[in-house]
A protein has these predicted regions:
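Carbohydrate-active catalytic/glycan-binding domains of CAZyme proteins
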Residues: 1-203
């Protein structure tokens, strides 16, 4: 399953579900025939949410969830193609525009990662829960912003990212885009994510 944001020629956008038999593809739309420009014959594939940055999370019990821009979230259907019920808003310690969400789980703790601000002012913050992917989140002890600009390393505006977990080494790698100084270059950076004894993320 691949959850992809597409912006059509008429500037309408959404997150779509694509599927493949192999992780390296080829991927096809899970439903419908594709996306078509206005005036072009064809029936559009339906979006799973009418917004960007759809990010799936599958819990240990097999239940799936989708998180997307503006802190919205919902449970996924069993076939992973639709959301169930009305979306809810994730509760976070910091307010303001947010996109690029991420959910992951480590040692029984759920981590909800979200961006704040934008452009060269992007930062990444997080919340923690021991309850469920959709509830019980609290601000971590210490600094809840774990990634921010580092001009000394020429890193400006670390934004939307994701986790790569290496089972062999038990390492968590956070990969993210870097906006750039003054104009976007969308470079990709990677940082090792380390944790304190209480599960909080080291900054």
């Amino acid at each position: 399953y691949l959850y992809v944001t597409f912006v059509k020629p008429d500037e309408k956008m959404g997150t779509y579900v694509m599927i493949a038999d192999r992780p390296d593809g080829p991927f096809r739309f899970a439903e419908g025939n594709g996306l078509f420009a206005p005036g072009v014959e064809g029936v559009d594939s339906p979006f799973i949410v009418n917004d960007i940055d759809g990010e799936p999370f599958i819990d240990d019990d097999g239940n799936g969830y989708l998180f997307w821009r503006r802190r919205l979230a919902a449970r996924l259907s069993a076939d992973r193609l639709h959301i169930e019920g009305e979306p809810l808003t994730m509760q976070t310690a910091r307010q303001g525009y947010s996109e690029g969400p991420l959910m992951f789980k480590r040692k029984g703790i759920y981590y909800y990662v979200y961006t704040l601000s934008g452009n060269q002012n992007y930062v990444n913050a997080y919340m923690m829960s021991r309850e469920s992917p959709l509830s019980g989140f609290v601000k971590p002890e210490g600094n809840d912003i774990f990634l921010f600009s580092a001009p000394e390393n020429q890193v400006w505006g670390p934004g939307h990212g994701n986790i790569f977990y290496d089972e062999k080494t038990d390492e968590y790698i956070f990969l993210y885009l870097e906006y750039g100084d003054g104009g976007t270059t969308r470079q990709v950076y990677a940082n090792r994510m380390e944790f304190n004894e209480d599960g909080t993320i080291k900054t």
